[in-house]
Amino acid sequence: MDRYNWFQRNLHTLALSKKLIKEASFDIEKILFLKNRYPDNHIFITGLARSGTTSILNALYQTGDFGSLTYSDMPFVLAPNLWSKVHKPKKSDSNFFERYHEDGIQISQLSPEAFEEVFWDTFDDRNIEEFKNYVDLILRRYKKTKYFRKNNQNIKRIGTIRNLYPNSKILIPFREPLQQANSLLR
């Protein structure tokens, strides 16, 4: 968060820490922008930390075929279309810097990231169908028909994702255990 000024830090705190604000922003987003249902041909990447999920994410994102949230969608990741009307990326948003994990991976404000976890933290299993609305809103935002997401926490949601999107692919990379453990120690 040291890359943000006082206003940006407080906006992030407000937008991401209050369930009421997250739910309200999602409700407004649906009212204003939810128009289409997109085909079920998405890709979900999940796995243990340092297993290669970020590398796969970046490779797929570079194809330009998929819609996915990026750092520029922060902090209103549950209202990406509405936020895009307010926040216009600057040229400097494409500048790369080391991500906050300090693991050597370079990102920009236009890089994809696992922001769908905000959805899962906001809504419980009774609202699981809302995830389809969320994915459709992201696809509308990026004018794509295929969604992809890397989220290591989805390892516990494989059944849910499979039920929601039976035609989608779930990629689970595996890494040699000693290499993975060594990577986690760094």
Regions inferred by a protein language model and the residue ranges of each:
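A short, well-structured juxtamembrane/interface segment
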Residues: 26-33, 127-140, 154-157
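Hydrophobic anchor at the beta1->P-loop junction of P-loop NTPases
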Residues: 45
